[in-house]
Amino acid sequence: MKSVFTISASLAISLMLCCTAQANDHKLLGAIAMPRNETNDLALKLPVCRIVKRIQLSADHGDLQLSGASVYFKAARSASQSLNIPSEIKEGQTTDWININSDNDNKRCVSKITFSGHTVNSSDMATLKIIGDD
């Protein structure tokens, strides 16, 4: 009986290691609580500058209305790029991938991503989750 348990545990651990090795490079970069009033200074500052090639946006706890987004790179000139984002994200919905670093300079690292927008159709503040892929 003990050997059956040991074999089962070994198989479970092997499966976990196998799946971890094949995991993608998608990482939750952070989340922003979206106020009910339109705000244009919502920022996600990355504590460690990281190379991010594309992002996805996801809404939790309510619907979001977005009017703009920009990504800022760590560079001497504080380079930035405006992002083409959807104007609305429904609760539980995740956007398609949004490409950044599109000027073929994939070595620039992202220091901050800013958003303009607010929560709609909810008494709670919705949460905007930002998922990155490097």
UniProtKB/Swiss-Prot annotation:
It comes from the Bacteria. The keyword Amino-acid biosynthesis does not apply. Coiled coil: none annotated. Transmembrane segments: none annotated. InterPro entries: UPF0412_YaaI (IPR020240). Pfam families: DUF2541. Residues 1-23 form the signal peptide. Keywords: Signal. NCBIfam families: PRK10154.1. Belongs to the UPF0412 family. This is UPF0412 protein YaaI. It comes from Escherichia coli (strain K12). The gene is yaaI.
